Amino acid sequence: MHLTLTEITSQEVAAGLEDKTIQVGIMRPLALPDSLVVFELLNEPLVAIMRADHPLATESENGIYMSALAAEPFVFFPRTYGSGIYAQVLSLARAAGFSPLITQEAGEVMTIIGLVAAGLGVTVLPASYRRMRIDGVVYRNVLDPGATSAVWLVQRKDEQSPMAKAFTELLTRNVAR
């Protein structure tokens, strides 16, 4: 038995499942073909991340609405990166009445948060990234309805190897606890 963990984008997970180069994927929500099946592992809140000395940081200790970020420059993933969170954050911003001005783009979360710490803008990411302790930034819960991000386990409907099936059962059983 051999398990290989590889970090790839949500788009790459979907493509790998389709072309059968991977058997099981873990990803953020993204439009998927009918040949794939999804099990939601968890759903977590989104957080706005900004410099600790940002004016909104002190005003928003109990959370922040997306509309408060309308005039802020955003640091985010490139549209072409294939991250499932991209469309969700843009949708939340549009629902709040604005289109984010993305002034800096990076493909890695550590870089995005580092650029925020350098004062180049704000970002919105899943709350699990709070674990990345970077000096000079604060994390504020986004209060808008629907400001959560799911993590999916995804696989092909039509076939599963015994190992993929065992892995899926292990993950889903542990999540159900």
Predicted regions and their residues:
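Secondary-structure junction motif
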Residues: 62-63, 72-96, 161-168
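Alpha-to-beta junction loops
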Residues: 17-27, 46, 98, 116-122
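Flexible hinge/capping segments at coil-to-helix
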Residues: 36-46, 50-74, 165
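Central regulatory/effector-binding core of bacterial HTH transcription factors
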Residues: 1-34, 105-106
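Short secondary-structure boundary segments
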Residues: 29-30, 52, 79, 127-128, ...
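A late-sequence structural motif
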Residues: 25, 75-76, 138-177
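Beta-alpha-beta core module
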Residues: 34-40, 44-45, 59, 110-157
